[in-house]
Design a protein with these regions (language model features):
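Extended, alpha-helix-rich binding/interface surfaces that flank or overlap catalytic cores
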Residues: 356-357
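N-terminal and secondary-structure boundary signal
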Residues: 1-327, 333-338, 342-347, 352, ...
Length: 382
């Protein structure tokens, strides 16, 4: 039975947060169940974009701090490592660590920040699609990886949590290469992300669900209080709890479908046990869930193939530029796997005929200047 602990946590106040964390970690056996004393441990937060903690796009630094404190009690060698959105270089990493609140929060703790941008090619014979991949070096060097994710919606994957967070072990713009190789949402979410998670094998996954992000996540949505911390040895089981909390059918999430397909969890979730506080107490019934490409795929599967292919191309949501907000920074152009974005005197311009609908541009725009527009015909059909 895969246990998932859910504990109420009303705020990021240190004392309030630590009290909730201690209950949660005790529920699942204590931190020493998941790491060995004196081991090398990498903490992998979600630092997808350079935003302040209160904006709800990244793992809150108080969670990182509390986990570090527990690991230091075990004399572990602790390192914070992440490959955020955009180029993977030292100056970019430093900016993310600073803006996301980690440098200030971890001041005084014997914790290292990773600035080594060396990439390691690794092999995973158990993988289905990514048997060979490049990962950031600290992941390959670590004895254990602790996965600290954020509860958010996602315009491509619909939901991002434990499994999806591990995409951040792929260095910098190599993420764009993978997106381009595996363009279909079902291929990327149901298979590739599962291959990456299988390689990393986090010993523990903890979700920051005190404040979540709804709507146009993972970076341009709205902050919404949920008031929980969640932890599990299984990121796949944890994601079922995450979906339940935001009133989302787990079967609409590609990583969940993949977890079931590869027998990592049962299709009726009977192998998952929620412990701690009653999860039903925290469900946000009106949480804003985005329309995503998977919704259109499910529609197209109901149609004859020719019509289904047309539906995929015509009514799948498309990225649209808000030129009042665009500052011509070019981050969308750098992040675009298909290389179909140019910057002119007006701002970013997307070649929609060649756009692969991965929405990396939307995800990494620092000004929320890119919106995902839903086709009106889908609303009518739906």
């Amino acid at each position: 039975m895969k246990q998932v602990s859910i504990r109420e946590c009303k705020s990021y106040d240190y004392d309030v947060f630590r009290a909730s964390f201690e209950k949660m970690i005790e529920d699942i056996g204590g931190i020493d169940k998941f790491v060995k004393e004196g081991s090398k441990v990498v903490i992998k937060p979600n630092l997808v974009i350079k935003k302040h903690p209160e904006e709800g796009a990244t793992t809150h630094p108080v969670l990182v701090r509390v986990v570090c404190e527990e690991l230091l009690k075990l004399n572990c060698e602790v390192m914070i490592a992440e490959s955020p959105g955009g180029p993977y270089n030292k100056s970019n990493l430093k900016g993310f660590y600073k803006t996301c609140g980690l440098i200030d929060e971890l001041s005084g703790l014997d914790v290292k920040f990773n600035y080594d941008t060396y990439e390691v090619q690794v092999h995973n014979d158990d993988a289905v699609y990514l048997k060979t991949m490049e990962v950031i070096k600290p992941i390959d060097d670590a004895d254990f990886v602790i996965n600290l994710c954020k509860l958010k919606t996602h315009k491509m994957a619909k939901y991002t949590g434990g499994v999806k967070n591990l995409y951040g072990v792929i260095p910098g713009l190599k993420k764009a290469e993978i997106h381009y190789r595996f363009q279909k949402e079902e291929l990327f979410c149901e298979n590739v992300l599962l291959d990456i998670c299988d390689y990393v094998k986090p010993s523990l996954t903890i979700m920051d669900g005190v404040y979540a992000m709804e709507g146009e996540g993972p970076t341009a949505g709205d902050v919404r209080k949920v008031g929980v911390l969640i932890a599990s040895e299984s990121p796949h089981a944890l994601d079922i709890a995450g979906c339940k909390l935001i009133n989302l059918d787990p079967m609409k999430v590609g990583t969940v479908r993949g977890s079931i397909k590869w027998n990592l969890i049962k299709d009726d979730f009977s192998d998952i046990e929620f412990i701690g506080d009653n999860i039903d107490k925290f469900i946000v019934k009106d949480f804003k869930i985005p329309v995503t490409s998977s919704d259109f795929r499910l529609l197209s599967l109901k149609l004859p193939k020719v019509l289904g292919d047309i539906a995929d191309k015509v009514i799948t949501p498309k990225p649209v530029i808000d030129y009042k907000k665009c500052v011509k920074c070019g981050k969308c152009k750098v992040a675009c796997p298909a290389k179909v974005i140019e910057i002119d005197e007006k701002g970013a311009k997307i070649n929609l005929k060649k756009c692969i609908r991965c929405y990396c541009c939307h995800e990494l725009c620092p000004k929320k200047a890119i919106h995902i527009k839903q086709n009106i015909f889908f609303k009518l059909i739906k």
